[in-house]
């Protein structure tokens, strides 16, 4: 599924928050997002099952739905990332891509935990390749 920049921005906002957000909260989190744009994007993402209504809350005197991402949305974003990487894989090696990803994380303890996670994954992948 192809997502336009506004849809990607709304998805990013929803994934970065640990709670469901109203459309107004999404507008306030985004750069240059308007209420009408966010509502149109949410309708499309709801139809595609990339977001879901997770509740209803009072927003002043009005009831507002709160939205959160679905598991499917993470899969779609992961696939978009991989498709983008595939377009540049002849230029950027996997090692350079991974090194660049680690360089973006300034939290050294988080970086160390992720390195250990990748080491475990690499050991598993190596074992699978050797067994074939």
Regions picked out by a protein language model, each given a short descriptive name:
Residues 1-13, 124, 128:
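Short alpha-helical segments that sit at the start of domains
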Residues 3-6, 22, 56-78:
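Short, cationic-aromatic polyanion-contact patches
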Residues 10, 40-48:
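Basic amphipathic alpha-helical segments that dock to polyanions
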Residues 14-19:
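Short helix-capping/hinge SLiMs at alpha-helix to coil transitions
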Residues 20-29:
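Short acidic, hydrophobic short linear motifs in intrinsically disordered regions
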Residues 33-34, 38:
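Short coil turns linking two alpha-helices in DNA-binding domains
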Residues 46-57:
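A short, conserved structural fragment
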Residues 74-128:
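Amphipathic alpha-helical dimerization/coiled-coil segments
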């Amino acid at each position: 599924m192809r997502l336009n920049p506004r849809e990607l921005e709304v998805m990013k906002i929803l994934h970065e928050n640990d709670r469901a957000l109203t459309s107004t909260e999404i507008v306030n989190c985004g750069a240059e997002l308007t209420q009408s744009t966010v509502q149109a994007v949410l309708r499309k993402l709801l139809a595609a099952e990339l977001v879901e209504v997770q509740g209803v809350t009072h927003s002043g005197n009005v009831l507002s739905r709160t939205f959160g991402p679905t598991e499917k949305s993470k899969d779609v974003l992961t696939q978009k990332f991989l498709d983008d990487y595939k377009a540049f894989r002849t230029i950027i090696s996997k090692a350079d891509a991974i090194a660049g990803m680690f360089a973006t994380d300034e939290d050294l303890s988080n970086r160390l935990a992720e390195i250990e996670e990748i080491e475990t994954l690499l050991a598993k992948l190596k074992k699978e390749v050797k067994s074939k």
